[in-house]
Structures are given as C-alpha cells and as structure tokens.
Amino acid sequence: MRQRAFLVLILGATLIGLVPIGVRLCEMHPLAVGFWRFALALPILWWWSRSLPKRGTSVPRRALLVLTGLLFACDIGCYFMAIRATTVANATLLSNCAPIFVALGVAATMGGVPSRLALLATAVALGGIALLVGERFETGHVLGDALGLVSAVFYGGYQLAVAALRRNQPAVRVMLWVAGVGGLALGVVCVIAGIPLMPTRGLDWAILAVLALVTQIGGQGAITWAMAHLAPVFSSVVLLVQPVVAAVLAWLLFADGWMGPWQIVGALLVLGGIVLARRAQADAG
C-alpha cells in the first residue's frame, strides 16, 4: 500500500505543479482565482461524497475539518498573491519551506522528533529547491517574499491537519470540507475587499476549470488520499516535486529563467531528498 501511496503522492505533486502557471495566465485577482478553484470543485466533491456511509462527525472532528479548510484557504491566498507580488522563483522557494514547519509541528504536536535521515532528506531537498531557483531569486520584493514564507507556515499546518484527519476520515469528506470552508473564506474576503469575482474572459474560465478539476480535485485529492498511508515529514518532502514541475514549466512556457547545470543539479537533489525520505519512511516501519 505504501508503494501505491508514494506513486499517488508523486502524481498529486506533479499536478499541483500546474498551479503557478494558471495563476500567472489568469487575469483575475489572486484571491478570486483561489475562490473559484474551490467553488468549481465543490459540486463534484459533493456528488462524490454522496456515496459515503451516513455517519455523524464529532464536534472536535468538525472543528478540525473547519480548521483544515481555513489553513488551506490562507495558504492559497498568500501563495497566489505572492506569485503576483514577487517573482515566481521567490514565491516557489519560500512557499515550499513547508517541510521545515511540518518537522517542527511533528515534534511539537506528536511528541516525537523526526529521524536524522528524515531531517537530512528535508535539508537535501530544500537545498535542491534553493539551487533550482537560486539564480532567479531577487531581493526587493519584501511583501511578496513575506507572503510566500507565511504561505509555507499555513501549508505545513494544513499537511499536519490532513494527516490527522485521514486516520479516520475518508479523503473525499476531507476534500469536501476543505473546498467548502476554503471557498467560503476566500469569497467573504473578496466581497469585503471589493475584489471582482466574475471572470471577464473565456480563457479565465478555462484556467479556473483546470485549477479546480486538475489541481484541486485531481492533485489535492491524490495527496489527501496518500497522506493516510505515509508519514507527514515524508509526504512533505515528496511534495517538493511540485516546485520542480513549476520551474520546468515556467522555463518552457515563459522563458522564466534558464535550466542550466545548477538548476539540473538542484532538481536531482530534490529527487535525492525524496529517495532519502523514502528510506527513512521504510526504516520507521
């Protein structure tokens, strides 16, 4: 099962690598893009969840489901705004510091410390991300960089919350609550801030549909399912496939930077970190 979960997690991470490309192509406000990513996915998730057994959910469990949705909404909001407020490279690097916060969260909330091999895997993979986008990292974007780093904190919290929920909650139920709560939160913020919610271009509708179907339902759905079978720190490291995919696509589509020798070394280090993390997962049993 872990082998299958690992492959599904890789697939999910690859699919969400499309997110920065969609945000850059869409002309809408980043928070409105985040709202529609959730809103368009919600009807499909609701229909899918109808097949689940009808059973009550305890108040603490519902509170955790709501918290998970809020954490992901905050992550999406901060990350999407960071993509517009700073360079894609800066936003990608800073928002993918989540494994650091996941490791700290595991130590703080679960009473355990990740193994040395798991910590080494995290360091190697993050070093690879730094090399991958290092030449494109620019200073002078304080607000955007801060948003990118804050999004990593929220994403780390989201991953820990999903890992806790998946011990006894189906993936579809978690995804439904995340989309519902996240969409409501971002929608309210857009209304209060006076941010237009309706797309004005057919291309924007197409981009929003891809973000909802491919990245939210497909990508996050795969990740949510896989996290029930894998350790949080391991999952967080594997998800660093996402910025590798995003960097390669940005280079191919927008000529955003150059995939030279150091970038290739960085991508290989990320893969090496994933291999080490997988070894740590196996050693942990």
Protein language model features and the residues they cover:
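Transmembrane alpha-helical segments that form core, pore/gating elements
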Residues: 16, 42-45, 102-104, 122, ...
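Glycine-/small-residue-enriched transmembrane alpha-helix faces in small-molecule transporters
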Residues: 1-35, 67, 78, 137-164, ...
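Hydrophobic/aromatic residues within transmembrane alpha-helices
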Residues: 26, 33, 37, 82, ...
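Hydrophobic/small/kink-forming positions within alpha-helical transmembrane segments
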Residues: 14-17, 21, 39, 46, ...
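Helix-helix packing/entry segments at the starts of transmembrane helices
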Residues: 13, 91-97, 161-184, 216-252
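Hydrophobic transmembrane alpha-helices of multi-pass small-molecule transport proteins
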Residues: 45, 49, 72, 104-105, ...
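Specific alpha-helical transmembrane segments that line the substrate/conduction pathway
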Residues: 32-43, 80-113, 151, 232-252
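Specific transmembrane alpha-helical segments of multi-pass solute transporters/efflux pumps
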Residues: 15, 51-89, 94-95, 129-131, ...
